[in-house]
């Protein structure tokens, strides 16, 4: 006897995460800090370093380099417009059928920069990964905010001398 699995409804195949991050740093400083955090300064919420390579140009790769031609491909830069836009598409952390689109839009606002973040994924993502993605983005964005604000503070101190 053949069993047929019932396909999940489309609602269960779409994951949307949005965040608004307020940074007390100039637009350019915030954008560079974001690239650094997504790249060589990336780390897991438990503090373990997980450096990534982000080739910040259209078609550039975003991947974890484990050395000796080993690693994990996360995505491609779909669009970049310094310092206001970064879009990445790809499987990200998934080792199963899933495609994601990340969008970072940076907007200058009074006192600094606002980052509007959208992660839309299509595929069967289990609940543990949905929760982990939300927590991971929260942590990564908080680290980027701190990095930008620290950099802006150092630059301001240098100008004051």
What are these regions (language model features)?
Residues 30-34, 62, 77, 88, ...:
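Hydrophobic pocket/interface hotspot
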């Amino acid at each position: 006897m053949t069993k047929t699995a019932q396909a999940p409804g489309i609602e269960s195949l779409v994951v949307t995460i949005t965040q608004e991050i307020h940074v007390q740093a100039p637009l350019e400083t915030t954008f560079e800090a974001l690239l650094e955090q997504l790249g060589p300064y990336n780390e897991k919420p438990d503090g373990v370093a997980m450096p990534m390579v982000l080739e910040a140009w259209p078609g550039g790769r975003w991947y974890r380099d484990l050395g000796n031609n080993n690693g994990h491909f996360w995505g491609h830069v779909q669009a970049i417009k310094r310092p206001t836009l970064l879009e990445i598409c790809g499987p990200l952390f998934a080792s199963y059928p899933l495609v994601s689109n990340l969008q970072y839009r940076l907007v200058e606002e009074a006192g600094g920069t606002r980052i509007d973040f959208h992660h839309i994924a299509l595929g069967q993502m289990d609940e543990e990964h949905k929760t982990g993605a939300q927590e991971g983005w929260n942590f990564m964005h908080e680290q980027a905010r701190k990095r930008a604000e620290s950099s802006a503070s150092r630059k301001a101190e240098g100008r004051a001398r």
